[in-house]
Amino acid sequence: MAKRTKAKSNHSESGKRMAIYSGTFDPITFGHVDVIKRALPFFDEIVVLISHSGKKKPLFEAPVRKQLVEDCFKGESKVRVEVHSGLLADYARKNNIHVILRGLRGISDFDYEFQMATMNNRMNQDLQTFFLMASEQYFFINSTLIKEVISHAGDVSELVPPHVEKKLRERLC
C-alpha cells in the first residue's frame, strides 16, 4: 500500500488561498453562481475551470461558456475563468492549487463527488475537496433540466442569469 502524506494547506506558493471550481457550465446557472459567491470569503481566488467531458456533448463551445461565466463575475477580482481539457488533478498540480470546490445538491451528488474527490486525491495527494451544500432555492437546478425547459419555451428566469437565458433562447428556441 502506498504511503500517504499529509496534505498541504490550501495556500499556493504565492501565499494565496486558491480553489478550483470545475464543471462544464453548459450553461452556468444561479446554483453555480451561488456556490462561487458563498465560497469567496474562504478563498483569495477561485478559478472557475470550464472543463470538457467526453461523456457530454455541450450546447455551447468552450469559449462561449467561458464568456457566459465571466459575464456573471464582472468586477469580481477574486474569480478567474479558464478552459481546460485534461485531468483536474494535473491542472491543480501545474498551477499549485490544493483545493477543489464542489457544490452538493443531494445525496446522489455526494456519492459521485466523493468518488471524484477520492480519485483526485489519489492522483494528487496535495489536493483536497471543499464541499458546499446548494442553497435551498437552487437545490433542484441542473443545466440539463434548464435546457429541456427552455427548449419548450418555459420560464427559466429564476434559474439562470439574464444573459445566459438570452443565449439559451437564441440557441434552442
Residue ranges and their predicted role:
Residues 1-173:
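Nucleotidyltransferase catalytic core that binds NTPs
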